[in-house]
Amino acid sequence: MAAGFLSALFPQVMLSEASPKAGSQCVFRGHSTGCLYLVDALAGDPEVLQADAETYYGELVKKSSSIPDVFSIPGGEEVKLEESCVYFVPLYRNNPTCKMLLLTDPKDKETVLAVYLNQCWWPVEDVVKTADPSRDGLISVQTFGERIVLFVLNYIIFGMLEGSSANDAFFLPHSATECAKIFWRNGEAVAFYSVKMKGSLCDGATSQCYLLPVLDTVFVRRKYRRSGLGMKMLDDFCQSFVAEDALGISCPISAAMYQVCQKFLQTYPEEQKRLWEVEAPGDWSQRVNIWLKIQMESSSSGRR
């Protein structure tokens, strides 16, 4: 495992203010007002945070008068807080006990509006923001708050809000120990990639382990695509494992990712022999050299 890949980069920051009223709406505006976003402020035991969410959900079901009735969507519209619009989903793959409470649009249950944490509702777009100016570029996922950001980017923003393209592959929630990096730009999480480490288990059903580091999932938010972020993440992945003779990218590779690979390998020809499209666990019978495949497909297209 590369030493720098999993280094601790930012400590968790405790909120100095008193806890908000259960079920309230959090709108944090950054350092200029002394406030922090969720990833900057979230600390404490995840089990306690989940217990808070379960308590809140129970009060919501009972229609307790102690919790707010509506959630204000950024832009002014209000959504009534009721049981039919709120549900739990697993935070991690293969771990149903750790759950996140989500609020959906009553007009479209596939649209998630907010996440419940720290005794308040956080609009989805606020969850992926930071007020910490040092949180910039690619940063390893370490804290529980960063795990939440990864979940929102992967499961909600990609899986529900921006995942309609036929070229995209559906991303399941990651495991609790998934090796991943989030790309931060201008105070916002705009992309991420995750890696299956060499020697890690392929899944919980077998004893097979990955035979090489594998770039497993890559996602860039739509408004930040075509700006070179895919190239930057692929380069960072390769630079994180300079001692490895072979690196994998999980099969199947999307058409958009193939374009990134082609441009990357043209720019860095020294990596052409190292990058392989692989199926787990990645032995030689499960590998196809990506550069060779690109050349063969280009040659085939030229003969048509």
What do the predicted segments below correspond to?
Residues M1-L212, C238-R304:
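Terminal substrate-recognition subdomain of acyl/acetyltransferases
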Residues T217-Q239:
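Conserved acetyl-CoA-binding loop-helix of GNAT-fold acetyltransferases
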